[in-house]
Amino acid sequence: MNYLAERRQEEKERRRAEILDAAEAVAASVGWDALTMDQVGRRARLSRALLYVYFKDKVDLMYGICERGLATMRQRFTEAVGRHRLGLDQILGIGRAYIAFSQEFPVHFDILARCELREVSAEDATPSEAACQAEGGALQVLMVGVLEAGVRDGSIRPDLGDPRVVANSLWGMTHGVVQLASTKAKILALHGVDGRAVIEQMMVMARRALVAQQ
């Protein structure tokens, strides 16, 4: 790639990042449902036509934000793994990192939840959707590797079955409980239940399900 081509690519990546920054800011202000592409364009100071060069529609833009969020999450997961020696503590650390991510990046977590509800496009995925899927796949690989390491070091029970199934089960459980505690906090409180206690109970149950018997 020559110098001019590199500059054009850098400019394209910079502008795409600015669009995503703008979309996240608008979403934080008005919510994703109320967000419009025109609002994002104004925030990014781009014409409507140029905005659609980078993202074909609002759903495509959503996947762009999702990819960003998952990349940040993967970084947090990796850091959590590095803080522990045993696989059990590493996978529980990943769970804690997920909880912290949902609280620190509410826009990303909301977008992630929305993407979770959509059918995966295998053949006609946009570049943003494909990149989002790739980041999600990398997270799964990381979790599976930690589970396998935990079985090898004796901290995770060996009879759980396919670690890919276990990883997806843990992901679904953690995501569902965190979302419940976030979106249903007031309803839970009416019944005398603290959403934070629900999350903590989920972590206790996860540990009991995973820990190897001594």
Give names to the regions the model predicted.
Residues 62-69, 112:
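Alpha-helical DNA-contacting segments of helix-turn-helix folds
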Residues 19-27, 69, 98, 102:
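Short hydrophobic clusters on alpha-helical segments that form packing/core surfaces
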Residues 109-110, 114, 129, 133, ...:
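Hydrophobic/aromatic-rich alpha-helical bundle segments in the mid-to-C-terminal region
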Residues 1-30, 34-43, 60-63:
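Basic, helix-initiating cap at the start of DNA-binding domains
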Residues 45-55:
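Short hydrophobic/aromatic patch on the recognition helix
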Residues 92-121, 140-145, 171-178, 212:
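Helical hydrophobic small-molecule/effector-binding pocket
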